[in-house]
Amino acid sequence: MLSVPHLDREFDYLVSAEQSDDAQPGVRVRVRFHGRLVDGFVLERRNDTEHFGKLGWLDRVVSAQPVLTAEVRRLVDAVVARYAGTRPDVLRLAVPTRHARVERETLAIPVSPLPLIPGPVDPSGWEVYGRGGQFLTALAESRAARAVWQALPGEQWADRFAEAAAQAIRAGRAALAIVPDQRDLDVLWRAVTTRVDERSVVALSAGLGQAVRYQRWLKVLRGSARLVIGTRSAVFAPVNDLGLVMVWSDADDMLAEPRAPYPHAREVAMLRAYQARCAALIGGYTRTAEAHALVRSGWAHDVVAARSVVRARAPRVVALDDSGYAEESDPAARTARLPSIALRAARSALAAGAPVLVQVPRRGYVPSLACGRCRTLARCRHCTGPLSLLDRATPGTVCCWCGRADLTLRCARCGSEVVRAVVVGARRTAEELGRAFAGMPVITSVGDTIVPEVGARPALVVATPGAEPRAPGGYGAALLLDTWALLGRQDLRAAEEALWRWMTAAALVRARGDGGVVMVVAEASIPTVQSLMRWDPASHAEAELAARTEVGLPPSVHIAAVDGTTGAVNELLQEARLPDEADLLGPVDLPQGVRRPAGTPLGAPISRLLVRVPREQGWQLAASLRRGIGVLSVRQTHQLVRVQIDPLHIG
């Protein structure tokens, strides 16, 4: 596979008689190209060629085991066309690195007969939702039903996924489920192995070692797996006779691939469902604008519960104005940065013997500081990154970007040496709550030290978004702090992501009938807060989609972000031959916090140009950019550019 874009095409080679039996479509081979050996795949065998020059010989067949199936190859081609990528880049995502010993050992073992078909599926869990029972019936009949599922608060989503997979397997088909991270994968594994024979289930994730991952992947390839579950790259798994593709929590940015061509697992899964003509399911506690667009277009059905059921299952949500807690008469409220009504709710839950969840947006102690006099943000003198406090005992500040310490902080604007906290992190919050609730255990769960589960006993659990532990029986209360840090970001998905973070935490709280309450420290008039209070993410997604359509933002349009030096971006535009309706936005400086494109000159200013086209011209946009990149790739002096189609964060 050649890494240069202009050589992303098929090449013809001669196959010797000794290699003929092994050199079948899909096998790995080594070929000589311009004097060096490169890896490749056999795509097809033909008796003729359209090449007019002299053909070279295949150097060797690396393995006689075909690893690139026809279905995966079609999916790879579709992803390349959708995201303006190259086949080598997508194939690296789709086909894992070979492990010779594992391959020899695996191929020496005969393929075992498939385990018994799962028993009948109890439909009661799905019948709570409108069209839920119909979706299971469609799976039993091997119909290509497509649905966007709105999970109820407190719902055991993994059980519903397991039931859907078991139904597809009972119909003689296979199923594929994609989740954001290892925690979700572990939860799903426990659920599916209670309904489907463990011998026919394979879990794939990036955390596996090369040998284990390749061994499991070969099991899928050989048809020994009826159900494959995994993280984002598992969406390319070579599942035989695929009948159902499922994606959980597509709002999670872990489903977006950080490597070129940056595909999103939701989009790849839907492409695969379309190509395979199989059923598809997108589920979550909230709903993205992209998932809702599938419903509004009629491509997918809406699977939601009646409002009466939602109200009965959801906790009571109370919005509290955060402007006045500093003046509260309760000293504990001032200490914990909480209105006294929120503290009373926490105390009531603790007194009832239930844990209390406290969600804070940032980890660390004080991750952001500002001048105490003029409120100018404190920034590093070396890289302009934000300065933070590590803990109470450590003197001075530390840069969050470069890690340099600054022992003598002085405001660059007014010269003051007084600082104030802009954002308070999880550890500082835990410290403050420990003082406000003397004698109460305080558990901290953050990105680097996640606690998977807490006991059903009184405790304060401070967690960052995505690190909330599960609690048997649910939390008695949840407090959502510093909500402005999520809502106030200048980002296309700020409101959508804030609601997802809040609902993911609130879904862990008991129903209102059992005393569950969620206190969100935010203005009740904010539309996103209102959606949380009503527990109505579908209407929020509808409003979000309408707003984006009005101003021309994805998913109502397709946008390509082109990053590189000004000269490189201009060269690409000249060669790309963009669609006539393409709208150019920018260029502007590369957004703060976005990494530079690989291979760009150090110190050179990097700009970002946005190219916007109507939704029906997305494939044309990708094709034109891919063609332009190929033309530039031929030139020895060209500078690299990075192209991302519909990136999560535009700028």
UniProtKB/Swiss-Prot annotation:
It comes from the Bacteria. Keywords: ATP-binding, DNA replication, DNA-binding, Metal-binding, Nucleotide-binding, Primosome, Zinc. Its cofactor is Zn(2+). Binds 2 zinc ions per subunit. GO terms for biological process: DNA recombination; DNA replication initiation; DNA replication, synthesis of primer; double-strand break repair. Zn(2+) 1 binds at C371, C374, C411, C414. Pfam families: PriA_3primeBD. Zn(2+) 2 binds at C380, C383, C399, C402. GO terms for cellular component: primosome complex. Transmembrane segments: none annotated. GO terms for molecular function: 3'-5' DNA helicase activity; ATP binding; DNA binding; hydrolase activity; zinc ion binding. Component of the replication restart primosome. PANTHER family: PRIMOSOMAL PROTEIN N. Initiates the restart of stalled replication forks, which reloads the replicative helicase on sites other than the origin of replication. Recognizes and binds to abandoned replication forks and remodels them to uncover a helicase loading site. Promotes assembly of the primosome at these replication forks. Belongs to the helicase family. PriA subfamily. This is Probable replication restart protein PriA. It comes from Mycobacterium leprae (strain TN). The gene is priA.
